[in-house]
């Protein structure tokens, strides 16, 4: 058996930055620091930060006054931001800069009196944060059927934007339908699209040309990790989303010659290497790094933590 390793894989710049913010805040202030929602959607990462003194909460009401509070990489609504200010917290914002760009774009379009459509998954924390960026209503669509139910004024400009963990491929069918239904609709700027989401999906497509199965390192609540699994499944290749090597079922490897391995944007490389070690123990004799898009993007932490 052999393993094909996808490139790029694992941490993106936004995840790197978010984790670094929590670690630097702990070093500067000491434990505990409070993090609103999981800073990134990965159990291994979250458990590691908990061990260092981070406390993860879903509701700011669970945070005592005058504490350190960090917003997760997914972003928060204006209401959550105000609630945190009201308890005199020291705030560090780990929102991915690409998510922040979407927030600013939504606010800008609404100031221009546009009706704004958000393509995304209902209930995802990034979507909840984007929906809560202003008092004006955004209309959320998840499917083509949702587009048919939109209640829009014919005399007001229309714009759309997307959840950053959805690639161009993920949203193409909805975008195409929106453009056919509303020919003058404004599209987001190209640089609002998350480079990491698209690159990791493109990497999986390359792997799937030569792989019998795909193993995706990532947590079940990670949107981008689930999309990687779905790409393989749409190509009729068995794919499994796993937290770590312990979750691999040996039956998956029966009669398999080539195993594709990748990791979602919030999964650390150490987990990939543990999987490789496990597979080598099970008979893998060759591990090949497959070429993909090069990434050299870095997002700095807030100046207060430098």
Curated annotation (Swiss-Prot):
Record bears the keyword Iron-sulfur: yes
Cofactor(s) of this protein: [4Fe-4S] cluster
Binding annotation for (2E)-4-hydroxy-3-methylbut-2-enyl diphosphate: 41, 74, 124, 164, 222-224, 266
Annotated GO biological process: dimethylallyl diphosphate biosynthetic process; isopentenyl diphosphate biosynthetic process, methylerythritol 4-phosphate pathway; terpenoid biosynthetic process
GO molecular function: 4 iron, 4 sulfur cluster binding; 4-hydroxy-3-methylbut-2-enyl diphosphate reductase activity; metal ion binding
Binding positions for [4Fe-4S] cluster per the UniProt entry: 12, 96, 194
Cofactor annotation remark: Binds 1 [4Fe-4S] cluster per subunit.
EC number: 1.17.7.4
Gene3D superfamilies: 3.40.50.11270, 4-hydroxy-3-methylbut-2-enyl diphosphate reductase, catalytic domain
Pathway: Isoprenoid biosynthesis; dimethylallyl diphosphate biosynthesis; dimethylallyl diphosphate from (2E)-4-hydroxy-3-methylbutenyl diphosphate: step 1/1; Isoprenoid biosynthesis; isopentenyl diphosphate biosynthesis via DXP pathway; isopentenyl diphosphate from 1-deoxy-D-xylulose 5-phosphate: step 6/6
Keyword Nucleotide-binding: no
Residues at which dimethylallyl diphosphate binds: 41, 74, 124, 222-224, 266
Superkingdom of the organism of origin: Bacteria
Pfam families: LYTB
Chain residues that bind isopentenyl diphosphate: 41, 74, 124, 222-224, 266
Keywords: 4Fe-4S, Iron, Iron-sulfur, Isoprene biosynthesis, Metal-binding, Oxidoreductase
Enzyme class: oxidoreductase
Catalytic activity: isopentenyl diphosphate + 2 oxidized [2Fe-2S]-[ferredoxin] + H2O = (2E)-4-hydroxy-3-methylbut-2-enyl diphosphate + 2 reduced [2Fe-2S]-[ferredoxin] + 2 H(+); dimethylallyl diphosphate + 2 oxidized [2Fe-2S]-[ferredoxin] + H2O = (2E)-4-hydroxy-3-methylbut-2-enyl diphosphate + 2 reduced [2Fe-2S]-[ferredoxin] + 2 H(+)
Catalytic machinery residues: 126
UniProt record similarity statement: Belongs to the IspH family.
Function, in words: Catalyzes the conversion of 1-hydroxy-2-methyl-2-(E)-butenyl 4-diphosphate (HMBPP) into a mixture of isopentenyl diphosphate (IPP) and dimethylallyl diphosphate (DMAPP). Acts in the terminal step of the DOXP/MEP pathway for isoprenoid precursor biosynthesis.
Protein name (Swiss-Prot/TrEMBL): 4-hydroxy-3-methylbut-2-enyl diphosphate reductase
């Amino acid at each position: 058996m052999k393993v094909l390793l996808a490139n790029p894989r694992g941490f993106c710049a936004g995840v790197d930055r978010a984790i670094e913010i929590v670690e630097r805040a702990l070093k500067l202030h000491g434990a505990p620091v409070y993090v609103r929602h999981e800073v990134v959607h990965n159990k291994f990462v979250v458990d590691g930060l908990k061990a260092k003194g981070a406390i993860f909460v879903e509701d700011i009401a669970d945070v005592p006054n005058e504490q350190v509070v960090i917003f997760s990489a997914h972003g928060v609504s204006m209401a959550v931001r105000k609630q945190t200010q009201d308890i005199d917290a020291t705030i560090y914002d780990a929102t991915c800069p690409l998510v922040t760009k979407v927030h600013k774009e939504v606010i800008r379009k609404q100031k221009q009196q546009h009706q704004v459509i958000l393509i995304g998954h209902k209930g995802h924390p990034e979507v909840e944060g984007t929906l809560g960026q202003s008092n004006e209503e955004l209309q959320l669509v998840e499917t083509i059927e949702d587009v048919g139910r939109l209640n829009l004024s014919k005399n007001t400009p229309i714009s759309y934007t997307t959840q950053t963990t959805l690639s161009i491929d993920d949203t193409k069918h909805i975008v195409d339908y929106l453009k056919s239904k509303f020919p003058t609709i404004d599209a987001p700027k190209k640089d609002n699209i998350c480079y990491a989401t698209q690159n990791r999906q493109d990497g999986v497509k390359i792997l799937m040309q030569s792989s019998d199965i795909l193993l995706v390192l990532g947590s079940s609540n990670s949107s981008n990790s689930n999309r990687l699994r779905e790409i393989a499944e749409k190509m009729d290749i068995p794919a499994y989303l796993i937290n770590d090597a312990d979750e691999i079922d040996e039956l998956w490897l029966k009669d398999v010659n080539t195993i594709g391995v990748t990791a979602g944007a919030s999964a650390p490389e150490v987990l990939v290497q543990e999987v490789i070690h496990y597979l080598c123990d099970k008979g893998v004799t060759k591990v090949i790094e497959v070429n993909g898009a090069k990434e050299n993007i870095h997002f700095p932490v807030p100046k207060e933590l430098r």
